Amino acid sequence: MEQPPEDQGPQREPYNEWTLELLEELKNEAVRHFPREYLHGLGQYIYNTYGDTWRGVETMIRILQQLLFIHFRIGCHHSRIGIIRQRRLRNGSSRS
């Protein structure tokens, strides 16, 4: 019969503490890539919609993660991560 593991390892920090640290890291990264006015408007929208709740914090984290992912995927000029679009040569010299 299957038994649960006896040792779960070291206890993780509380969820709320970890969540707030994650939000702070995402905000710090977002201000390096997006206009402050845009981020302020997003924060106001989240606050007006969810108030000062954990649901609002989780929503803000999800939106910032999505924005940063798309930003890097498109090709951020501040990062080496992303798609580097190469110009196609019309003379056919790149063909083998």
Curated annotation (Swiss-Prot):
Post-translational events: Phosphorylated on several residues by host. These phosphorylations regulate VPR activity for the nuclear import of the HIV-1 pre-integration complex.
GO cellular component: host cell; host cell nucleus; host extracellular space; virion component
Gene3D superfamilies: 6.10.210.10, VpR/VpX protein, C-terminal domain
Region (Homooligomerization): 1-42
GO terms of biological process kind: DNA-templated transcription; monoatomic ion transmembrane transport; protein homooligomerization; regulation of DNA-templated transcription; symbiont entry into host cell; symbiont-mediated activation of host apoptosis; symbiont-mediated arrest of host cell cycle during G2/M transition; viral penetration into host nucleus
Family affiliation: Belongs to the HIV-1 VPR protein family.
Described function: During virus replication, may deplete host UNG protein, and incude G2-M cell cycle arrest. Acts by targeting specific host proteins for degradation by the 26S proteasome, through association with the cellular CUL4A-DDB1 E3 ligase complex by direct interaction with host VPRPB/DCAF-1. Cell cycle arrest reportedly occurs within hours of infection and is not blocked by antiviral agents, suggesting that it is initiated by the VPR carried into the virion. Additionally, VPR induces apoptosis in a cell cycle dependent manner suggesting that these two effects are mechanistically linked. During virus entry, plays a role in the transport of the viral pre-integration (PIC) complex to the host nucleus. This function is crucial for viral infection of non-dividing macrophages. May act directly at the nuclear pore complex, by binding nucleoporins phenylalanine-glycine (FG)-repeat regions.
Designated name of the protein: Protein Vpr
